[in-house]
Structure formats: structure tokens, C-alpha cells
């Protein structure tokens, strides 16, 4: 039978994801191998205001597998279900992404024609995410040496991606950002570095052909 669409899978799992306190960030369906008859791999990306732990993601994956099996959208074909939280390289595209990234360093590219927040600045720059206020985001520029806060309309930002940090920000820099989002680790700490390095591996995998398959870490 034909492979179901990503839109159809999204419709089937959206209610469950919301009930479990997550946001559905995306669904991707690929083949788990190079052969044309390789089993489908369904990757579901979820996130929440607090840091999602592996147990919660694993439980959601098990429930999601039941939902997909009950609808029989894959027929008798085995498939691989992978539920994961967003990696740090996933762009910030919605207001909630900015809210959850508060306190983190991001690489920003402005839209053509948008004025850089610092006079004489370029359209591409790094900043620390501050408090989201409606359609504007506070950004802390200048790093540890000269931290200062500016405001930029979200509409002026073409692309923004969180950066992995290996040392903590300056105290004043983080203060101007308003701290970090609740439930998220402080940037540059061992906990944050470990989370950034392992977040794409925090998956719960269930194959319809093998119900004993467990959790990959």
C-alpha cells in the first residue's frame, strides 16, 4: 500500500501530543535504508516549555505507536517510529521557539532590507535571546565585554539558529536577557552541553514488526 503522507500522520497524532503537554513541531517520513522496499521511518518532533525528559518521550512514543497501529495506515508493512525533541540546529520559526530559547545564544540572519539593530552592523550576527514581547524579541548584543539590549521585530528575522556554548555567558549578559527559560539548563554548563550533544539521540523507537524493541539512548 502507498506510504501515508506526513500531513495524515500529523493529523492522527496531534491530539495525543497536545494531551500529553507537548507541541507537535514536525513529522517526517523517510525510508530506513537505501532500498526501495526498506521499511518507512516516521520521525515525530515534539517540544514543551519545560525540558522534555527521556521517560516522557518514551511514554509518548509507545502511545503514538498504538494510535498508528489502530488506524492501520501502514497496513501489514513494518515501520519504525522515532519520537524526538528538536535538535539545536532546528531554526526558531514560531514565537514559542523564541520563548523557550530565552538566555541562549543564536545566530541571526535578517531579511533583505531590514535594518541591523546596531548602527553599522551586518545582516548576520550573534546575540543572546531575551524576553519575547508580542511581535518583538529582546536581544543582547556585545557578548561579555559590552552587553547591551536591543529589540528586533520578529518579522525582520529571516533565520535564527541556537548555538552550542562551551562556557557560561557573563552575568550581566544573562541578566539583560532576563535569565533562561523555566526548566531549561543554564547555557555553557555541563548539563546544557550534554543536552545539546545528545538531544538528537533522545529518541524512543518502536517497530510495528517487533513490539519488544526498546529505547535508544
Curated annotation (Swiss-Prot):
GO biological process entries: ribosomal small subunit assembly; translation
One Gene Ontology cellular component annotation held by this UniProt entry: cytosol
Annotated compartments: Cytoplasm
CDD domains: YlxS_C (cd01734)
This protein's UniProt keywords: Cytoplasm, Ribosome biogenesis
Pfam families: DUF150_C, RimP_N
Family under the similarity heading: Belongs to the RimP family.
Role description: Required for maturation of 30S ribosomal subunits.
Name used for this protein in its record: Ribosome maturation factor RimP
